UniProtKB/Swiss-Prot annotation:
The keyword Ribonucleoprotein applies. It comes from Kluyveromyces lactis (strain ATCC 8585 / CBS 2359 / DSM 70799 / NBRC 1267 / NRRL Y-1140 / WM37). This is Small ribosomal subunit protein eS6. SMART domains: Ribosomal_S6e. Belongs to the eukaryotic ribosomal protein eS6 family. The lineage of its organism: Eukaryota, Fungi, Dikarya, Ascomycota, Saccharomycotina. PANTHER family: 40S RIBOSOMAL PROTEIN S6. Phosphorylated. Keywords: Phosphoprotein, Ribonucleoprotein, Ribosomal protein. GO terms for cellular component: ribonucleoprotein complex; ribosome. The modification Phosphoserine is found at S232, S233. InterPro entries: Ribosomal_eS6, Ribosomal_eS6-like, Ribosomal_eS6_CS. One of its GO terms (biological process) is translation.
Length: 236
């Protein structure tokens, strides 16, 4: 079985193949989300704690969280479900998925290091893979740098260097949800426009109601006149 071990703190991951079945037997009958002591896998993982994140069986079918079986099942999957990506709006499909309980039929098991042990694992804990892009949303930039609402977020945007031919220049993402004076002015303008439109609609509705009442009274008067004429002709 292969163990795909990831360390989110450093942004690294590595696939380690373990031929001895006795070493991976500790994972059997465990579910996705459960934690396992690393020392039972091998002495090189002493002090480590692994969390089971998923895996694939020998035919390539992925494990699905919530399916409490150690076998493969066919489920009707739709948009929002894991292990399925719909191609059309509202499309559903019955697909084979592997249950969330670990068994000997798995080819790859995905693990996350939740607690670091004594020794370094080559290529995982001793390396770091920096993030290529920084945060883009204004609140996330504030959270990333520990800024207050008074600080200007635009000074803290992470720029990246781009080289095109002989020239090199820096590039920064457009900050999303940034509150600027122009945005506040636009918001005020939209609000005043909304109030003006609502007032115009109210006035138009009142004018229409007045006209309708006038037409109804005119029709009523006409009918009364017709009745009066009819009554006078019958008397004559």
């Amino acid at each position: 079985m292969k163990l795909n071990i990831s360390y989110p703190i450093n942004g690294t991951q590595k696939c380690i193949e373990i031929d001895d079945e006795h070493r991976v037997r500790v994972f059997y009958d465990k579910r996705i989300g459960q934690e396992v002591d690393g020392e039972s896998v091998g002495d090189e993982f002493k002090g480590y704690v692994f969390k089971i994140a998923g895996g694939n069986d020998k035919q390539g079918f992925p494990m699905k969280q919530g399916v409490l079986l150690p076998t493969r099942v066919k489920l009707l999957l739709a948009k929002g479900h894991s292990c399925y990506r719909p191609r059309r709006n509202g499309e559903r499909k019955r697909k084979s998925v592997r249950g969330a309980i670990v068994g000997p039929d798995l080819a790859v098991l995905a693990l996350i290091i939740t607690k670091k042990g004594e020794q370094e694992i080559e290529g995982i804990t001793n390396d770091t893979v920096p993030k290529r892009l920084g945060p883009k949303r204004a609140n996330n930039i504030r959270k990333f740098f520990g800024l207050t609402k008074e600080d200007d977020v635009r000074d803290y945007v992470i720029r990246r260097e781009v080289t095109k031919g002989d020239k090199s220049y820096t590039k920064a993402p457009k900050i999303q949800r940034l509150v600027t004076p122009q945005r506040l002015q636009r918001k005020r303008q939209q609000k005043s426009l909304k109030i003006k439109n609502a007032q115009a609609q109210r006035e138009a509705a009142a004018e229409y109601a007045q006209l309708l009442a006038k037409r109804l009274s005119e029709r009523k008067a006409e009918k009364a006149e017709v009745r009066k004429r009819r009554a006078s002709s019958l008397k004559a």
